[in-house]
């Protein structure tokens, strides 16, 4: 099994296609329901070894998709690399590049000369995997808000069913940032015998109360938009774009640090040397930037998927789910070696969460390494500080 690739530049996996697989069995969910006819969107990079033992699963964050590396064969109108400094980082290639292209490829952190890297769009997504915008086989209409509430465990359960359908039963590693790191931790606990190593980056064993609050505000911005229509806006010609844009603005600010915003924008005015005394138009460059981010995000992402992904990551709590409220008890079944990477300026997923998890693993005699990288960009560092993460991951996977 190999990826479909062409036009390969040095260090690149080339041009790739997103493919699709329908799970052969209904998928049971934590909420007690099950999903029939689950489709998974995925991409692969590198070559599967004859023993099928060189597989790395990379897991995306809230707004990602299956296109993690290379150039999309059919680029979307808006790419997933639309965050902080995207234009200066990617230039005209941004809409076609995978969201973690700097980390996946020959000689990169997840070296496709050694590993067969798999990326899926998460259950509940809007980029090819079954989610709220998919057709409910029982009604013939989009699920909308009738889609069942899902958890990170459900996402991982879908990934495992997908990999089993490909004939893959062992993973050399599971890696991801933010929500992706939560999936890696879930894999290590739920399917520990299947996973040799995990790499949770800028992640946590449970989101802190401030993170819960920011996610709640973003979700409320969406459902307060009249065009949300109770979640059944598909086919009406309207969508909750205003609420979704505000949710993106809120989320985007939580991904950045105060110093990053100060360095890039300060208090620079948008289009003049003095204020224009306009109530509604952006006066400051940072206001214009947030509006640009909101408009781009609305064009590529589904509001209901945002609601479901946000809810899933707020439910995630290893201690509550697996340890009766004690993290030390929750992680006792982990056998995979663990590399934790955190960033000094990340206040949404602060280093303290990774430090607490590392201490629990260490006290339980588990193999764990923790690296806190001093970097100024906040939570988005896991997408921006690729060069500094690469040697840590390469050494860990050797």
Identify the meaning behind each predicted range:
Residues 43, 51-136:
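N-terminal cap/lid subdomain of alpha/beta-hydrolase-fold enzymes
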Residues 194, 200-296:
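Alpha/beta-hydrolase-fold enzymes
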Residues 140-146, 153-173, 182:
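Conserved acidic catalytic loop of the alpha/beta-hydrolase fold
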Residues 170-212:
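Conserved hydrolase catalytic core segment
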Residues 1-58, 67-72:
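Catalytic-loop region of hydrolases
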Residues 321-327, 350-360:
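Short alpha-helix in the alpha/beta-hydrolase fold that links the catalytic acid
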Residues 334, 340-342:
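Short beta-strand/loop motif that positions the catalytic acidic residue
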